[in-house]
Regions:
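Nucleotide-activated donor-dependent transferases that construct or modify glycoconjugates
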Residues: 1-12, 37-38, 58-61, 72-81, ...
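C-terminal amphipathic helix plus adjacent low-complexity
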Residues: 268-271, 336-338, 408-476
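Active-site-proximal region of nucleotide-activated glycan assembly enzymes
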Residues: 53-54, 124, 135-150, 167-173, ...
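Catalytic binding pocket for nucleotide-activated donors in carbohydrate/polymer assembly enzymes
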Residues: 206-209, 231, 368-445
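Conserved catalytic-core segment of nucleotide-activated headgroup transferases in glycan assembly
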Residues: 15-24, 242-342, 413
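Acidic donor-binding loop of glycosyltransferase active sites
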Residues: 161-163, 337-348, 353-367
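Short N-terminal targeting/anchoring amphipathic segment
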Residues: 5, 96, 102, 153-172, ...
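Conserved N-terminal ligand/cofactor-binding loop architecture of enzyme catalytic domains
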Residues: 33-152, 313, 331-334
Length: 476
């Protein structure tokens, strides 16, 4: 029986690949070993998996060098994706420059940003070190100073694996080192791209895996144009997170989370004035006589908010028709804080289908939850205007959203003044037919008659078969 190594390098992969049944078909058909970063907040949970084979460690100094190289490559290749530039603007805290207020106050914010960006390891030093004169020298020195992780090397060299699989956001040292080890040991590597924007928002691979599993056709094109993969290296897999949305379409309706009709407002990890927008939405509901009197707003802030210029703390006492999402409220009651990231909190995916399905309309800044809402056949309003605080969250930087306007019921709100009219239209939206919606969303997310575990097993079999064929043909 072929032996496969699966490496888990982030807590979110514990939720997306271990808590789901993503690996179930592999576990039935192959001898599977799962290893994980021992510093994970959910490391103990991983160790309880029947396929668990051990932990590996990541040296902080080495990780910093990897991340510096990733950021230099991001800047160097920024013309390949507008989101690369956005990432640098965000990392350098560009949004902290004030665009409103007295001139002196705005000028001082610029000076303050320059000082902070000079000290920030992700700030001004990135474009300097990635400049044409310095990049070849600096990147070469960094690559030579990055040996393969010894723990990963030990796992790969002592266990004679037939294949190595790893989920990745395309911005981690583990994927680089496993790709290098695979080449050294003649073991095929399969990288599972985890999220929608990963191929256009992080960096470019400086050591590519042999094969890559992506969400859909859009990501396939990005893998070729941004990262230089060949068509033969790319497999359309989808994501294990979303199988439940398609299953929920035909399943009996579950008990509703809320007894009242609601507009769902989903927050973004990226900075956006969500509290101000909630006030605006509440005023719209209260001033429009055509809106049902019992229609409320459920606010689901992103659990891993980044620092923002606008108020971020939701206080129910400031609203009359807005309720905090129950799952997030429970997390806040347990200690989760706005504008902070707690990797141990990984929201249960089973909560999402009914939350999205039961919403009258879903509204929010540009976040993957809007795409998930479209999969649940809900009308969606994507807020793509300048919110008055954060100038770099506009639609022009989020290339993965290109084409979403073709999805039935999905609209972009490019001006705050249009929100009322678009909400009115969304509330009057005719029922969205699954077959019509799927025709458009399938460009972003591959869909067929198989589940994600079945597709992953099918792709793995194809990779193993092609590797055996290549080995036979290479023999004298």
């Amino acid at each position: 029986m072929p032996r496969i190594l699966v490496a888990i390098s982030a807590d979110i992969y514990v939720r997306n690949y271990l808590r789901t049944d993503a690996l179930s078909s592999l576990q039935k058909q192959y001898d599977l070993d799962i290893i994980a970063d021992k510093s994970l907040a959910l490391a103990n949970e991983v160790s309880q998996d029947p396929s668990f084979a051990g932990f590996f460690s990541l040296a902080p100094d080495t990780e910093r060098k990897h991340h510096l190289l990733f950021n230099l490559l991001m800047w160097r290749h920024r013309k390949k994706s507008r989101t690369f530039l956005y990432r640098w603007l965000r990392n350098s805290q560009w949004h902290l420059i004030k665009r409103q207020g007295p001139l002196l106050e705005r000028a001082l914010s610029v000076v303050s940003w320059i000082v902070k960006a000079s000290r920030n390891p992700h700030g001004l030093r990135i474009p300097v070190l990635a400049s044409a004169p310095l990049f070849p020298l600096v990147s070469g020195l960094l690559r030579r100073s990055l040996p393969v992780n010894p723990d990963l090397e030990k796992f790969v060299t002592t266990n004679h694996y037939d294949m190595i699989v790893f989920p990745s956001a395309a911005f981690d040292s583990v994927s680089v080192d496993l790709s290098r080890l695979g080449r050294q040991r003649n073991v095929p590597t399969l990288c599972l791209i985890d999220n929608w924007d990963n191929l256009t928002s992080k960096t470019v691979f400086w050591k590519k895996p042999d094969f890559i599993g992506v969400w859909g056709e859009q990501a396939r094109q990005q893998a070729m144009s941004v990262h230089g993969f060949s068509a033969e290296q790319i497999h359309l897999l989808g994501t294990p997170r979303f199988d439940s949305y398609f299953a929920a379409r035909d399943a009996p309706e579950e008990e509703r989370h809320y007894e009242f009709p609601y507009v769902l407002f989903v927050g973004s990890a990226m900075p956006f004035d969500e509290i101000g927008t909630l006030h605006a939405l509440e005023r719209i509901l209260e001033s429009d006589p055509s809106v049902p009197a019992n229609l409320r707003i459920v606010y689901r802030p992103h659990p891993w908010q980044q620092k923002r210029n606008s108020p971020a703390v939701f206080d129910s006492r400031d609203f009359s028709r807005v309720d905090l999402d129950l799952q997030i409220k429970a997390a806040f009651d347990a200690g989760l804080e706005p504008e902070k990231t707690d990797p141990a909190f990984q929201p249960e995916l089973g909560y999402y289908p009914s939350l999205l399905r039961d919403a009258e309309v879903v509204i929010g800044p540009l976040t993957t939850m809007l795409f998930e809402s479209a999969l649940c056949l809900r009308p969606v309003i994507a807020l793509s205007y300048f919110d008055g605080y954060h100038p770099n969250t506009g639609r022009r930087y989020f290339v993965h959203f290109e084409g979403m306007e073709r999805v039935p019921g999905f609209t972009f709100c490019n001006r705050a003044s249009d929100l009322h009219g678009q909400l009115r239209s969304a509330l009057d939206q005719e029922t969205i037919r699954a077959e019509v919606s799927d025709t458009q969303t399938s460009y972003f997310l591959f869909q067929d008659h198989l589940s994600y575990p079945e597709r992953l097993a099918q792709v793995s079999a194809s990779v193993l078969k092609s590797e055996k064929r290549a080995t036979r043909t290479s023999k004298p």
